[in-house]
Amino acid sequence: MRALLLLALLLALVLGQRLVAPEEVARAQVIQKALPAVVRVQGSALSPGGEDVVGTGFFVGPSQVVTNYHVIRDLKDLTVRLADGRTFLAERYAVDPGIDLALLTVRGARAPGVLTFAQVEARRLPLGMGVVLVGFPYGQGPLASFGILSGVGPLEVPLPDPSVGAEVGTYLFTDAPLTVGNSGSPLLNLQG
C-alpha cells in the first residue's frame, strides 16, 4: 500500500512538471526581459482644464523612449517612471502624428533595458501567433497581458489638420487587452 502511494506521488510529481506549457514559459521569459525597458509616461495638461494623461513607453536606446504621439500630444512637464519606481524628466525629440509615434529623450537616466525592433515585413507575421503587451494600464503596473496577432492590414488614420490628409499604414491588430494607460506599450512576440 505504501509503495503504491509513493508511486502515485512520484507520478503526480513527474506529470505536474509538464503542466506548464512551453508557450507559457516563453511568455514569462519575454515579460521578464521587457520589464526593465518599459516605462510609465506622464505629464501635466498643456491648457488649464485639460486632462493629465498617463501612458506607456519603452527604451529603444540608452536615453530614448518610444511612445504613442497621442499620449504626449497635449502634455507638458513630461516624466517617465521606470519599473523600479525612479522618475526622470523627459522631452520630445521627434514626433510623427500620422503614425502616432513620439520619440522622447530621458534626462539623467540610463536605460535599464532596451527593446529592439525586428526587421520583419508585417504581412509575413502569422495570424494567431502569441503576443505579449507590457504597460501601465490606468497608470498602474507595470502589468502584462497576452493574446494573439489577430490581423495585419492597412488602417487610414485621419490627421488633426485636414489639409494634410490621412496617412495609411500597415497596422498590427491584437486581441490582447488594451486599456487606458497601455497606449505606447510594446507588442512583443514570444521570441521577444
What are these regions (language model features)?
Residues M1-V38, Q42-A45, G50-D52:
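N-terminal targeting leaders that route proteins to membranes or the secretory/organellar pathways
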Residues V14, A28, K76-D77, G192:
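Proteins with a high burden of low-complexity, intrinsically disordered sequence enriched in S/T/G/P/A and R
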Residues L19-A21, S47-V54, F59-L143, Y171, ...:
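Conserved active-site neighborhood of the chymotrypsin/trypsin-like protease fold
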Residues A28, V38, D77-L78, G184:
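Short, acidic/polar N-cap/turn motifs at the starts of alpha helices
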